[in-house]
Design a protein with these regions (language model features):
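Extended, low-polarity transmembrane helix blocks
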Residues: 1-17, 66-164
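Solvent-exposed, well-ordered loop and adjacent helix/strand elements within mature globular domains
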Residues: 9, 13-49
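Hydrophobic transmembrane-helix microenvironments that flank and shape a buried ionizable site
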Residues: 10, 47-50, 54, 64, ...
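Internal, well-ordered alpha-helical scaffold/interface segments
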Residues: 32, 49, 63, 73-76
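Juxtamembrane loop-transmembrane helix junctions in multi-pass integral membrane proteins
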Residues: 37-44, 64, 90, 94
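Short hydrophobic "helix-edge" motifs at membrane interfaces and signal-peptide entry regions
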Residues: 43, 56-57, 103-105
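Hydrophobic, membrane-inserted alpha-helices
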Residues: 51-60, 84-85
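Transmembrane alpha-helical segments of multipass membrane enzymes and assembly factors
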Residues: 60-66
């Protein structure tokens, strides 16, 4: 049940960013947000986060490639904490990282416990679970976050050179 609920939350947030559903910003607004966070190129970063949340959330909800879906979702949460929420403290009421931490922890709990018997992974005989799978998702997610922000800083647009 946790897998379906948490995956559904990510799908909803991804669709807000991707399509503008439920008063979300859509891709244009997400691109502007990425630009303001100096996540370059903003169009690529916007699509990456929107798809990671939508596809990763759907995969988590269905129990498809669960540790890999979890890694993508953890990457989005780690990046959100690092780029937006960390300096605001813990509580969500002050735009802190509370919500992101809860979602990332729930994702890790799903991976540690396994996708469950009613999942695509279980039907396919790929029922990975345990601390090793959770550790993989956590490390891969953190690495993904640092990769995305490293790419963002290396691809920062520069002003065109002026003619002398």
């Amino acid at each position: 049940m946790l897998r379906v609920v948490v995956g559904g939350v990510f799908v909803a947030h991804g669709l807000q960013k991707l399509r503008g559903y439920w008063d979300g910003p859509g891709l244009e607004g997400t691109e502007k947000m990425m630009e303001s966070l100096e996540m370059h190129p903003a169009p690529l970063q916007a699509r990456a986060v929107a798809l990671a949340e939508t596809v990763g959330g759907g995969a988590l909800a269905l129990g498809i490639a669960t540790p890999y879906a979890a890694a993508a979702l953890i990457a989005t949460m780690v990046t959100a904490v690092r780029k937006v929420h960390l300096n605001n403290g813990f509580f969500n009421s002050k735009r802190g990282y509370e919500y992101n931490a809860v979602l990332a922890t729930a994702v890790l709990a799903v991976v540690a416990d396994g996708p469950g018997v009613i999942s695509v992974d279980a039907v396919g005989g790929n029922h990975r679970a345990g601390i090793g799978s959770a550790l993989f998702a956590l490390v891969a997610g953190i690495a993904g976050s640092f990769f995305a922000t490293g790419v963002a800083s290396s691809l920062k647009p520069t002003a065109p050179a002026e003619d002398a």
